[in-house]
C-alpha cells in the first residue's frame, strides 16, 4: 500500500491530547493545526504537523505517496458511532405514522410492535439477508464520515437469534471497511412468551446466553434496557454483574422514558457508558461523573420521538465525559448521519461545536474502548480520517442537513470519494 500524504488542510482538527475520554473544558480542545498535514503509512498515522514540517520530514519520499490536496478543507478523525443496532431485519416505517397519530413508544411496544416486531423479522431473516441489509447501512455510515461503529444484538431475544446477530456482526467486521465493535444485548426487551415471568427470562440470559457469548468471544460489552415495564434495576444489575464475571464490560440503556435509577446503577456497576439518559436525575448525573461513566447521548432519538433531549450541558458542566451517537435502529432513530447528530447535540443539548466533535470522536471511541487506535489524529493510531468540503469545524455543525463529506479513509485506504 502506498503512503497517503494529505496536505494544506485549512483546519486539521487532530483532537490530540491525553488519551481517553475528555471531560469539562477539555471537551473544547481540538488541537487544530492550520495548513495541516498527515502522513499515513501501512494503515497508520506516521506523522502529523504543518505542511511545511511534513514537507521537510519526508522530503526524500514525497514521490512515493498518493498526495491529497486539502486546500480550503477541514480534516478530522473518522467519526465514531458508539451506539447502534445495525444488524436487524425488516423495517418499521408504519410506526412513524402511528406516533404522529398519537401512539407512544410503550403503546406501540405493548401492541406487539416496536422491538417485538423487529425481533420477528430478524428471527425470520437468514444470516446472508442480514449481511446484505446491514452492509447497506454501513455503506451509508461511511458516506457520512463514520469509520467505526458499535453494533448491538437485541433483536432476537432467544439464544439462536441473538447469536445469529452477533455472528453477522463478526462477519461484517471481516468483510466491510467500517469497523464494528460488538455488544450483546439480549436484555433489550422481555419476549412475549415470558410476559409475567420476567425473572425466568433473566435466568435464561444469565445461564444460557451470556456463557455462549463469552465462550465464542462474540461481544466485548453486555448491555441491558433498564426501564419501567422492561427490566428493573435489580434485574439489570444481575445481568450486568453476570456479564462482568465472564469478562464482558457493562453498558446500560438508562432513564430513557422515566427516571428509574438507571444512571445510579451505571455508576454502581462501573459501566463504561450509560445510554439515552433523557430522564436521568441530578443525583444520577453526579454519581456517573464521580464514577467516570461516559454519558452516551442520542439526540436524534429524542427528536424522532418528540421528547426533550438529555441534559448534555449539565452533564459536561458536572464533570461527565459525554459521547454522542445516532442510535441507528428501525424504530426510534433510523439514521446513519453523525453530522446531523452533532448539529442536534448543539441545538437540543447546548453543546458547542467543538464539544460535539469531541463527543463524536475521541469520547465516542472511549465509550467502546477503542480510543487507543481511533478517535484522534496522532502518530501510531489508525489512518482513519475525513476530509470535508468546508473549511472550519464550526461549519460542520452550522451548515446542517447537508452531507459535507468529501473523502474518507479507513486504515489508510480511501473508502469514500
Where are each of the predicted segments found?
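Metal-associated gating/positioning segment near the N- to mid-region
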Residues: 61, 65-133
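Conserved beta-strand scaffold positions in the cores of enzyme catalytic domains, especially
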Residues: 5, 64-69, 182, 408
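Histidine-rich, glycine-flanked metal-binding segment
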Residues: 2, 13-76
Amino acid at each position: 500500500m502506498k503512503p497517503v500524504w494529505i496536505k494544506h488542510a485549512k483546519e486539521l482538527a487532530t483532537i490530540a491530547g491525553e488519551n481517553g475520554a475528555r471531560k469539562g473544558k477539555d471537551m473544547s480542545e481540538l488541537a487544530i493545526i492550520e495548513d495541516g498535514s498527515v502522513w499515513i503509512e501501512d494503515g497508520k498515522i506516521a506523522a502529523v504537523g504543518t505542511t511545511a514540517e511534513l514537507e521537510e520530514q519526508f522530503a526524500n519520499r514525497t514521490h512515493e505517496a498518493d498526495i491529497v490536496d486539502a486546500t480550503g478543507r477541514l480534516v478530522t478523525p473518522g467519526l465514531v458511532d458508539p451506539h447502534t443496532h445495525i444488524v436487524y431485519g425488516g423495517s418499521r416505517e408504519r410506526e412513524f405514522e402511528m406516533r404522529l397519530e398519537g401512539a407512544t413508544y410503550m403503546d406501540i411496544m405493548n401492541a406487539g410492535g416496536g422491538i417485538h416486531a423487529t425481533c420477528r423479522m430478524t428471527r425470520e431473516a437468514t444470516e446472508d439477508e442480514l449481511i446484505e441489509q446491514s452492509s447497506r447501512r454501513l455503506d451509508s455510515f461511511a458516506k457520512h464520515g463514520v469509520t467505526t461503529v458499535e453494533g448491538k444484538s437485541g433483536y432476537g431475544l432467544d439464544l439462536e437469534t441473538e447469536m445469529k446477530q452477533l455472528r453477522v456482526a463478526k462477519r461484517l467486521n471481516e468483510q466491510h471497511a467500517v469497523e464494528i465493535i460488538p455488544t450483546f444485548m439480549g436484555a433489550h426487551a422481555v419476549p412475549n412468551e415470558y410476559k409475567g415471568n420476567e425473572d425466568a427470562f433473566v435466568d435464561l440470559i444469565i445461564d444460557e446466553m451470556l456463557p455462549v457469548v463469552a465462550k465464542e468471544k462474540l461481544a466485548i460489552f453486555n448491555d441491558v434496557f433498564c426501564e419501567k415495564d422492561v427490566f428493573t434495576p435489580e434485574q439489570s444489575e444481575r445481568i450486568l454483574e453476570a456479564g462482568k464475571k465472564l469478562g464482558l464490560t457493562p453498558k446500560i440503556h438508562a432513564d430513557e422514558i422515566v427516571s428509574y435509577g438507571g444512571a445510579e446503577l451505571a455508576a454502581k456497576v462501573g459501566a463504561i457508558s450509560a445510554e439515552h439518559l433523557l430522564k436521568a436525575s441530578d443525583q444520577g448525573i453526579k454519581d456517573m461523573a464521580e464514577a467516570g461513566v461516559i454519558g452516551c447521548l442520542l439526540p436524534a432519538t429524542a427528536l424522532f420521538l418528540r421528547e426533550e433531549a438529555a441534559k448534555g450541558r449539565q452533564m459536561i458542566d458536572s464533570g461527565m465525559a459525554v459521547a454522542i451517537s445516532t442510535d441507528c435502529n428501525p424504530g426510534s432513530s433510523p439514521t446513519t448521519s453523525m453530522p446531523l447528530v452533532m448539529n442536534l447535540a448543539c441545538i437540543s443539548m447546548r453543546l458547542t461545536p467543538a464539544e460535539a466533535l469531541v463527543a463524536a470522536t475521541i469520547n465516542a471511541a472511549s465509550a467502546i474502548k477503542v480510543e487507543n487506535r481511533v478517535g484522534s489524529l496522532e502518530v501510531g493510531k489508525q489512518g482513519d480520517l475525513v476530509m470535508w468540503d468546508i473549511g472550519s469545524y464550526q461549519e460542520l455543525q452550522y451548515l446542517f442537513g447537508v452531507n459535507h463529506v468529501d473523502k474518507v479513509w479507513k486504515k489508510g485506504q480511501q473508502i469514500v470519494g
